[in-house]
A protein has these predicted regions:
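Short, non-helical or kinked segments that cap or interrupt transmembrane helices
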Residues: 42-47, 64-77, 120-129, 274-279, ...
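Membrane-interface helix-loop-helix modules in multi-pass membrane proteins
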Residues: 65-100
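Interfacial segments of multi-pass membrane proteins
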Residues: 80-87, 266, 391-406, 412-416
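Boundary regions of SH3-family modules and the immediately adjacent low-complexity/disordered segments
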Residues: 177-233
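Hydrophobic, membrane-embedded alpha-helices of multi-pass small-molecule transporters
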Residues: 16-32, 246-259, 276-277, 312-345, ...
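N-terminal alpha-helical transmembrane segments of multi-pass membrane transport
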Residues: 1-67, 134, 173, 510-517, ...
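Membrane-embedded alpha-helical modules
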Residues: 88-162, 218-221, 225-298, 410-518
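Membrane-embedded helical hairpins/re-entrant loop segments and their flanking transmembrane helices
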Residues: 3, 7-16, 38-59, 330-403
Length: 527
């Protein structure tokens, strides 16, 4: 084999050592990489495949010199969840938003190449990027708590449901209410169900079904042909077929236990295990869930050892262009934040290895690699890709900076994508386990935003920073559902980002009092 090809494959290291260290990088990235699809409803196997191939694309573009792994970006979780919820779990619309994010990376890559790094980052002062990260984390808070407090279950075959959002004749998924108790029709389960599993009930039949006439027109009542679809309990009732009071305290116990385990690992564990507190927390919460009878192994039993990932291609089926616009405006603006994060990640990576990757191979190349990886992932139905700080931590801990170990980690990820049992196990993880993990992760996202403000010494005694932060936070959090103009909905995240950038450019850096005080000081100094 050609010597240069051998060095690219093994990085000049022994094959056995490179493979072992590559496997360690898999453990470092695995928990976070599969957590994003677990929290958003995307397919875990598709995610692993996309991140593996995305990492190889990144290494090809960056000349194979940057020891980085492309993992699932947490910054996009809120936006992905919003799109998935609005359009009944249709991941193909998410793909449009993810691809738009990748295209934005390509544009930023060209801009960096043309104008230089400093000219581009001037549009994103710390007060804007810090507040954007805080907004992202805070918008995720309801998702975290819903995983803890909401008991989920399947609507049984033969049940009558009321379609409250969507058209079963046109949409793949519709939002339904299942009024399971005729004596208490205000207690119901609601959630997204596949339209193909529903059959329209006759008007007379619908009128007499569990008091539905008081809540809907008969034409909205349907019969469930096949059990399935995750449903969310809106109001607790002991008569509910999916919940009991005992079940609810078990959910809280599992969530709190998961949080405690993660905190203990982060503070008191040393060595390799300190790098994977999230994965350890998930395993611990999963084991407790098994003991409490909360785990359904059906997905594990039915999964084959070898399986093809279930792709959600962006152009599959009829396209609702208003949904595409919503997905793009909801997801793509987050690239503004992740662009700054990318610069920080590459800088941190270089600080660990002793190389300035912003200069060689250049920030424009790392952005290009990240953008192409994200576009590929969006096309297949995966999440946005980002350079993982978890793997930078492994580099620092092992002091082995061989980029080839990351390429082998990518190959391991690709192989795992075709192991069906892995996807089955991930699908069987109970909601309270992910809820406990989410409390930690989503809170930390907002904390990172606060840290950015502190590290950059953003002075909140100045009106400039107060106004920008205040307006961004109120619009970003207050318009969490976005603004709808006609058939197009623009996300609150996008609105906050645009307002922050505009205000940072048009507002004077100092108000009248500050300018007067500065002038007085200059006058005094001149005497």
């Amino acid at each position: 084999m050609d010597r240069n090809k051998t060095n690219y494959l093994w990085g000049g290291d022994k094959p056995g050592r490179t493979l072992t260290l590559g496997l360690q990088h898999v453990f470092a990235m695995f928990g976070s990489t599969v957590l994003v699809p677990a929290l958003t409803g995307l397919n875990p196997s598709v995610t692993l495949l996309c991140m593996g191939i995305g990492t190889l694309i990144f290494h090809l573009v960056t000349k194979g010199v940057v020891p980085a792994f492309m993992g699932s970006s947490f910054s996009f979780i809120t936006a992905i969840c919003a799109v998935m919820t609005k359009y009944g779990g249709n991941a193909s619309y998410v793909g449009w938003g993810i691809m738009a994010s990748g295209v934005l990376y390509l544009i930023l890559s060209g801009a960096v190449k043309l104008f230089g790094v400093k000219r581009i980052t001037e549009f994103f002062p710390p007060v804007v990027t810090g507040c954007m990260i805080i907004i992202i984390g805070m918008m995720l808070a309801p998702t975290a708590m819903n995983n803890v407090t909401t008991v989920r279950g399947d609507v049984p075959q033969g049940a009558t449901v009321v379609v409250t959002q969507g058209d079963p004749a046109a949409d793949p998924f519709v939002f339904c209410e299942y009024h399971y108790d005729a004596d208490h029709p205000d207690s119901f389960v609601s959630g997204w169900l596949p339209a193909e599993n529903l059959a329209l009930k006759a008007d007379a039949e619908a009128d007499e079904t569990n008091g539905l006439a008081a809540y809907t027109n008969p034409g909205n009542a349907y019969t469930v042909l096949k059990a399935g679809g995750v449903s969310m309990l809106s109001e607790a009732s002991e008569s509910s077929p999916t919940v009991s009071g005992t079940m609810r305290w078990k959910y809280w116990v599992v969530a709190i236990f998961t949080i405690i385990v993660i905190v203990l690992v982060m503070f008191f564990v040393r060595g390799f295990f300190k790098l994977i507190p999230i994965l350890i927390g998930i395993v611990a919460g999963y084991l407790l869930s098994i003991a409490l009878g909360l785990v359904d192994f059906t997905a594990v039993r039915e999964a084959s050892w070898f399986t093809l990932p279930k792709f959600s291609f962006f152009a599959a089926g009829p396209i609702d262009w208003s949904a595409v616009v919503f997905a793009i405006t909801m997801i793509a603006p987050i690239s503004i934040v992740t662009f700054v994060e990318h610069v920080g990640d590459i800088t941190a990576n270089g600080a660990v290895t002793g190389h300035n990757y912003l200069e060689e191979p250049g920030l424009h190349r790392t952005l290009l690699g990240c953008g192409l990886a994200t576009i590929f992932s969006g096309m297949m139905g995966g999440p946005a890709a980002t350079t993982y700080s978890e793997n930078t931590g492994v580099l620092a801990a092992t002091k082995n900076y061989n980029p080839a170990t990351l390429r082998f980690a990518a190959l391991f990820a690709i192989i795992l994508a075709f192991v069906g049992k892995v996807s089955g196990v991930l699908q069987s993880i109970p909601a309270p386990v992910m809820g406990g993990v989410s409390v930690i992760l989503f809170g930390m996202i907002s904390s990172v935003g606060l840290r950015m403000l502190v590290e950059n010494k953003v002075d909140f005694t100045r009106s400039y920073n107060l106004i920008i932060a205040g307006i961004m936070l109120v619009f970003g959090l207050g318009l969490s559902s976005g603004i709808t103009v006609g058939s197009v909905t623009v996300s609150g995240t996008a609105i906050a980002a645009v307002l922050g950038i505009i205000l940072s450019k048009i507002l004077p850096k100092k108000d009248a009092d500050e300018r007067r005080e500065e002038a007085a000081q200059k006058a005094t100094a001149g005497k």
